[in-house]
Amino acid sequence: MVATNRCCVFALLFALLLVHSLTEAGKGKEILGKIKEKIIEAKDKMKAGWERLTSQSEYACPAIDKFCEDHCAAKKAVGKCDDFKCNCIKL
């Protein structure tokens, strides 16, 4: 009789542990999903900031000629920095 009760207690504890593990796994997926969303949002913000910066290449022109070149290439032109100003020359 005692052995049967111990077996039932262990089976009950095992079932509770299994249910608990499954619910925690669900929460884990939820947390990982939230982390993934935050990473995607951060990537999108960085990409938008980079695009905004390259679209305003005249601000970066004295430091990096490449910004002017990329800005004008998007307009299908050739870019050149002259005295803090990005000049786009159509081909």
Curated annotation (Swiss-Prot):
Q: Main localisation, per the record? A: secreted
Give the UniProt subcellular location, in the record's own words: Secreted
Q: Name one GO biological process term.
A: killing of cells of another organism
Q: Which InterPro entries match?
A: Long_scorpion_toxin_alpha/beta
Q: What keywords tag this UniProt record?
A: Cytolysis, Disulfide bond, Ion channel impairing toxin, Neurotoxin, Potassium channel impairing toxin, Secreted, Signal, Toxin, Voltage-gated potassium channel impairing toxin
Q: Which domain of life is it from?
A: Eukaryota
Q: Name one Pfam family in it.
A: Scorpion_toxin_alpha-beta
For molecular function, the Gene Ontology terms on record are:
potassium channel regulator activity; toxin activity
Q: Which GO terms describe its cellular component?
A: extracellular region
DNA-binding among keywords: no
Cystine pairs annotated here are C61-C81, C68-C86, C72-C88
| Signal peptide (residue range) | 1-25
Please state every residue range assigned to the domain named BetaSPN-type CS-alpha/beta. Answer: 58-91
Q: In which tissues is it expressed?
A: Expressed by the venom gland.
Q: What else is known?
A: The fragments 26-37, 34-42 and 43-52 described in PubMed:18718845 correspond to the propeptide and some additional residues of the chain. The authors do not know if these fragments are the result of the post-translational maturation process, or if they have a biological activity of their own.
* Family according to the record: Belongs to the long chain scorpion toxin family. Class 2 subfamily.
Supply the name of the protein. Tityustoxin-19
Q: Which organism is it from?
A: Tityus serrulatus (Brazilian scorpion)
